[in-house]
């Protein structure tokens, strides 16, 4: 291993305990305590900040799904020396909740040597090796998420079925879902597939853990990656997909917003929420839940299907057409082929 003795792994249940932290501080004498994810998992750690911070700084890599700004997190934010945001939305949240805390923005990233676009012949070879002959010419939609309520896994299957019905595409499109179909926090996906009559390979389940290299191959094989979560801090799967050159369909919520649109360009199809609800729990008293509607999603699926197997080809086709139109028809001083005078026979 490249890090050798500089990298140590300590097994823990959950996210650790106060005693484990105290022991590691005494035995290893680290220079920085770095931790990340949802603040709900680290209240126990902030409880001993007065023991930790006199010795070394606490750096928290944070993501938050949505507004309103969670003022109930202020006590947690103030318990860090430095906060680093994963998404631009999170950066705005930290700024509003605890502006006095040192703040930086470092977005998620992927390994570009793994998640990268492959030549078209390589993509076709992956399809030939991974799919039976009857599936190779289908438009393949990919979904890579946890099977949980906010990820809208069941909604996706129901709406995908309606999309197939509406446009008569049962033998033209396929949805591959890489997830645990029996996750206790989600829906029984195999049951939904059977109930809706999607057992003829319209919806496939990928349930085994796979290497990053094989996952990148699936992104390259797919025509589009979907994420319609009603709350999403960032959305790593869609970032991996874009890194492989595969466009995305996403709900414009959380960190997904900054992935699909940037500098005036779109890297897929954004779907704007049609409704907002304020939900909450005992630990998270309030947060917006962004929901898209069925019609907008089915329209996005059909638009992606009409684009054909390669979004880049779609963009290139438009660029070539516009250049051709300009060459043949001109503009301003070079305008040709148009005459606004028409002669009509008058009785």
Can you say where each PLM-predicted feature lies in the sequence?
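Acidic anion/phosphate-binding donor-loop and adjacent secondary structure
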Residues: 70-72, 95, 110-132, 187
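Carbohydrate-associated surface elements
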Residues: 89, 109
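Nucleotide-activated donor-binding/catalytic signature segment of Leloir-type glycosyltransferases, i.e.
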Residues: 186-209, 213
